[in-house]
């Protein structure tokens, strides 16, 4: 068995990931809140649509491994970023709000994309995952369940990046208008429950107020913790949509990496490991996710994205409006009830 394409592929991916990580830590990237994850996929796409086809057979096995197994490992290790103590800091209000926003956003996206826009189901599911939970990381995690093609994943990530970036500029303006209706703590929960990416949530909070920033990040982390049960629900939903008779028992494919993700978060809550070791796991996790993003970019072709047309961006715009307007109404209502 020729193992060269595997190891050469991993080395190639590692080089791109290291470069993306370096660029993601520059002052320019910090100023414009451009994460290493986004840089990795952009680098991957740039290389993948230019010189990569000339030597793809020499590295393909390693690239595919990075896109699959390394991604799942990264999702599992993501649990070391969270503890259940985070939930107690923001209370029941944030938990209920996050759950309602996750479910409503996903099914709003699915209904709109599949029934009215007649879009590809896998693309709609990926977009719904990214908009309702934690952006690009959720899209990539959902890809492992849906088995979607690379160009569909890239389109979904593009939607998350574009409209999440738009949120960085619009939410601070909305805060000025909404101060008479909700306080800084409540607005933080609103940001955390409705903005796509963790980095975008932090950027918005920092641009407004420390209270907003802290509450928003914790609220967002609660949404991230809902990733595993969401993936289980998505797996069940995909099984139901396969056209199997209702009288037939359905075999639900369990994404075990999602179950392990919950297990790691629970374990991390007991604070049994030295902080230095947990920090190391988080750093390894970041590198694995960056690597899988690079692999995704390499296997994405611009021509395939063009074929998607305008419908994905129409879906992105309407979902963004739901997150901003519907999200505010949900948060305002919950704040009055709880």
Swiss-Prot record:
Cytoplasm among keywords: no
Alphabetical UniProt keywords: Cell membrane, Membrane, Transmembrane, Transmembrane helix
Pfam families in the cross-refs: Cons_hypoth698
Range of residues in the leader sequence: none
Coarse class of the protein's main subcellular location: membrane
Membrane-spanning residues: 5-23, 33-55, 62-84, 94-116, 123-145, 155-177, 222-239, 254-273, 280-302, 312-334
Topology term for the membrane: Multi-pass membrane protein
InterPro entries: UPF0324_pro, UPF0324_YeiH-like
Keyword Nucleotide-binding: no
Protein name: UPF0324 membrane protein NMA0465
Similarity comment text for this entry: Belongs to the UPF0324 family.
Subcellular location, record wording: Cell membrane
GO cellular component, one term: plasma membrane
Highest taxon in the source lineage: Bacteria
């Amino acid at each position: 068995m020729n193992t060269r394409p595997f190891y050469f592929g991993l080395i190639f991916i590692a080089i791109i990931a290291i470069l993306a990580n370096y660029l993601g830590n520059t002052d320019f990237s910090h100023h414009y809140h451009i994460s290493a994850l986004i840089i990795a996929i952009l680098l991957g796409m740039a290389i993948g649509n230019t010189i990569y086809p000339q030597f793809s057979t020499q590295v393909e096995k390693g690239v595919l491994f990075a896109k699959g197994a390394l991604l799942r490992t990264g999702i599992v290790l993501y649990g070391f970023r969270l503890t259940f103590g985070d939930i107690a800091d923001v209370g029941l209000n944030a938990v209920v709000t996050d759950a309602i926003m996750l479910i409503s956003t996903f099914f709003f996206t699915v209904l709109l994309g599949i029934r009215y826009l007649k879009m590809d189901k896998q693309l709609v599911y990926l977009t719904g995952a990214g908009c309702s939970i934690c952006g690009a990381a959720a899209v990539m995690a959902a890809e492992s369940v849906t088995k979607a093609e690379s160009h569909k994943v890239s389109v979904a990530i593009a939607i998350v990046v574009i409209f999440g970036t738009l949120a960085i500029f619009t939410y601070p303006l909305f805060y000025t208008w909404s101060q008479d209706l909700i306080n800084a703590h409540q607005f933080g929960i609103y940001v955390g429950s409705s903005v796509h990416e963790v980095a975008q949530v932090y950027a918005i909070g920092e641009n407004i107020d420390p209270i907003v920033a802290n509450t928003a990040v914790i609220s967002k982390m609660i949404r991230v913790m809902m990733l595993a049960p969401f993936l289980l629900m998505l797996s069940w939903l995909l099984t139901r949509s396969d056209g199997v008779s209702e009288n037939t028992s359905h075999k639900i494919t369990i994404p075990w990496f999602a179950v392990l993700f919950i297990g790691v978060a629970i374990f991390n809550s007991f604070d049994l490991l030295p902080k230095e070791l947990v920090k190391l796991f988080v750093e390894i996790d970041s590198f694995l996710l960056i690597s899988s993003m690079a692999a995704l970019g390499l296997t994405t072709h611009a021509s395939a994205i063009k074929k998607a047309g305008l419908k994905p961006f129409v879906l992105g715009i309407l979902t963004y409006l739901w997150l901003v307007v519907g999200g505010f109404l949900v948060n305002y209502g919950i704040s009055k009830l709880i």
